[in-house]
């Protein structure tokens, strides 16, 4: 059995694909197979894959219609033969000894290994280290010891969910899949893996280099950002399944506060579509939330008000005015109270 199956979803990355494949095929640890899932590319990516496959028998190409990264990774899992599975993005690259270093953990048969990611810009310059990708809080908590969810429960949902930051035992993820046709699917996959795992290691080294193709401050807000609601509902279901419902406060914060911040940051031209999607998702989730004791009895009143505004408003302007009027009312009451206490 091959030791590591490397799964690479590929979609229109002709500019970056060679660097990605070179970093995998030249690894100092070579007991690997490389599963490239061509996810309906329309550029020269398929030709690049064929050229590399002709020169390296470890490369397997699977082609499908465009279904997104989650579906492509699932196909990779189903075709993997390795003892461990690694998910890589096709516009990034690995350090040359990444798998050799990770192999040092595998005698203990961990469910998965986590490690640090370095970010870089288009011009090749290194971005400042980001705690989300370097996880210093995880290092200080677990060090070099094996851990599980219970050891990190207070910040479990703030761990890095990026697939390239983890190496999974294939048998361990045999019943875990990425949600398909939706953004932020890696949140659900990682959360289920974290809740299920009993033997996790953190390797405090940079092994992977993640490309930042566009500054987030210039990225237009997409209606797909509202996928956060459906994804968070899936995580709420996992919390219930694994009896980890202590995360509800944080998850409802994402559903309401974070979603409204996305809406407020959007250009006015985007707000009608964003509002329609928010309202659609809130209505679709209403029976689930209204039967949840936390939502009914403990939810922040501001979030409950926002929910009601979305359900009752007929357009985005009514929604924004409804929510903002509540915020203004709170500020007015706070200022009055502060004057009385002065």
Predicted regions mapped to residue ranges:
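Donor-binding/catalytic cores of nucleotide-activated saccharide
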Residues: 69, 90-201, 211-222
């Amino acid at each position: 059995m091959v030791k590591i199956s490397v799964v690479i979803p590929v979609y229109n990355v002709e500019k970056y694909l060679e660097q990605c494949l070179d970093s995998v095929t030249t690894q100092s640890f070579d007991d690997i197979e490389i599963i490239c899932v061509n996810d309906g590319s329309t550029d020269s990516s398929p030709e690049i894959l064929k050229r590399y496959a002709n020169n390296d028998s470890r490369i397997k190409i699977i082609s499908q219609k465009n279904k997104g990264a989650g579906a492509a990774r699932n196909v990779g899992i189903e075709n993997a033969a390795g003892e461990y599975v690694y998910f890589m993005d096709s516009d990034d690259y690995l350090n040359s000894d990444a798998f050799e270093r990770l192999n040092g953990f595998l005698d203990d048969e961990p469910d998965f290994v986590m490690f640090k990611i370095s970010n870089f810009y288009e011009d090749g310059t290194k971005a400042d280290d980001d705690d989300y990708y370097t996880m210093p809080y995880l290092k200080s908590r677990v060090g070099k010891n094996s851990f599980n969810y219970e050891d990190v429960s207070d910040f479990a949902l703030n761990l890095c969910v990026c697939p390239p930051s983890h190496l999974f035992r294939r048998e361990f993820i045999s019943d875990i899949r990425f949600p398909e046709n939706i953004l932020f699917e890696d949140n659900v996959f990682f959360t289920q893996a974290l809740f299920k795992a009993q033997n996790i290691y953190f390797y405090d080294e940079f092994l992977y280099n993640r490309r930042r193709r566009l500054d987030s401050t210039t990225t237009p807000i997409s209606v797909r950002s509202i996928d956060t609601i459906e994804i968070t509902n899936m995580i709420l279901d996992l919390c219930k399944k694994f009896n980890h419902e202590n995360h509800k406060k944080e998850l409802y914060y994402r559903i309401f506060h974070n979603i409204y911040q996305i809406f407020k940051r959007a250009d006015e031209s985007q707000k009608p579509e964003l509002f329609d999607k928010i309202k659609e998702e809130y209505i679709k989730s209403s029976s689930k939330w209204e039967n949840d004791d936390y939502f009914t009895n403990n939810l922040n009143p501001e979030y409950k008000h926002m929910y009601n505004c979305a359900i009752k408003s007929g357009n985005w302007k009514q929604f924004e005015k409804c929510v903002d009027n509540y915020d203004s009312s709170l500020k007015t009451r706070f200022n009055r109270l502060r004057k009385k206490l002065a």
